[in-house]
Amino acid sequence: MRKSKSTLPADAVPARRRFVQTAVVGGVGAALLPALAGARELAAAPPVSPEVRGFELDELTIADLQAGMTSGKFTAQSLTQKYVARIEEIDHRGPAVNSVIEVNPDALAIAQALDQERKAKGARGPLHGIPVLIKDNIDTADRMQTTAGSLALVGSRPAKDSFVAQKLREAGAVILGKTNLSEWANIRSSHSVSGWSGRGGLTRNPYALDRNPCGSSSGSGAATAANLCGLAVGTETDGSVVCPSSANGIAGIKPTLGLISRSGIIPIAHSQDTAGPMARTVRDAAILLNALAGADPRDSATTASAGKAAADYTRFLDPNGLRGARIGVARKYFGFSDSVDALMSTVMEEMKRQGAVLVDPADLETYGKFDDSEFLVLLYELKADLNAYLATRPDAAVHSLKDIIEFNERNREKEMPYFLQDIFIKAEAKDPLTSKEYLDALDANHRLSRAEGIDALMDKFHLDAIMAPTGSPAWLTDLINGDHSGGGSSNAAAVAGYPDITVPAGFIAGLPVGVSFFGRAWSEPALLKIAYGFEQATKARKPPKFLSGVETARVGTGL
């Protein structure tokens, strides 16, 4: 969950959503991260902007990496080794971005096997041999842990891969490691610090190290932006893919609920949870979406995708995707930042030049009406869904939300040094999912966000998509007061379970800002066409410089 002061109850705002071991496989050595045994110390940010040398793999796309493996310039092993070395160099040392909570100790062995398979049979597809990082709430049945950043799950390993991990392995990807996150996907406290977890410490924004990476997929966003992987996977309940994508200058896709299975993912709420691709380009995000989508008997929501999921999302990528597109401008998601509004005005003029038809304003009539019901549903589903998930982890030290609350109280110094667990406590007090209060709130969520919300707006103006700023530029990380972000447009698509794609739009004082395109259920093809057209017209992404802070003299807007 991502915090948004504009969209959730003021009394309980839900949050957004070293390593050196030498491994030698087939003569290839690399520093690999073993699982952390306990809490990571929160190191001070570097006092001055560190010098970060260029990296051979900086900004390389999946196509670039595959071309390198085809030509013999790279192998899966060499790519894995290079990314692991880079993680050691700038994630652990140097600017200490701290985005990777654990590197897969078997990554090089997996890469070696994939290289041998490529030689014998050819590549399985575009992800063959590509190192991918996944969020530390996604189960892997290997030597890595899955903890949601909590010390309560340290030492317990899942018995079975999540469907996401299974699909990545089937596609031939190298699961490089796990990324840090806002602990428990940022649903523990209304005063939380995005990007902080008891196990992983604080992830920093690579564009300005004193700024927040947003969350809860903080590490996936920061690591992708910092070129520590080919691709990453995040998860979202409300904002946790799109906000860290925006704050870290990358593309992120929050798909329609049911397009990607949630089985084996530590949950918040089954009515909103989903995994999603995070990448430096829209094309790479679409490639990853291809690999992750699919029906899973362990997640009944995926059966709804039958006949609705595309076989190949990359075929919808059109450099002229803005031409003729009718896009509604959701003005009620503006007004939280003058500089963001000015940047949006600039990019909207470019969209018009590219042939887009902007319907302005085009606001949801139900804007703000499902905030309270959303939070209520999350409280109910958190307790039920987390308890059900923990039943699959019999060797864990905790077996229920109540156990987690008690664990945190016993370990306050390490688990609650900056914020407490008021949302957990509220959730624990809730009744089963048969409660009328829950069922009424869930019905309100769906009605207000779907039929009377996004669907009604798109019907009224005959829209292909709705656009809004994804959020504000990255805020200063504040361990004392917690997050203080402003604005955010994720909630309607999140509550509806509809798709939402964010693309880099430009910079404010050197900090990236994204624009979101969202729409009806199963409209990923239309949204990808528009997002790709926007990306190709603006080319707004620029890699981070790992500065210690923003260059205030450059405050302004621009592509």
What is each model feature region?
Residues 147-150, 204-208, 216, 266-274, ...:
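Flexible glycine/proline-enriched surface loops and loop-helix/loop-strand junctions
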Residues 304-305, 439, 461, 470-491:
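Short, surface-exposed loop/helix-turn segments at secondary-structure junctions
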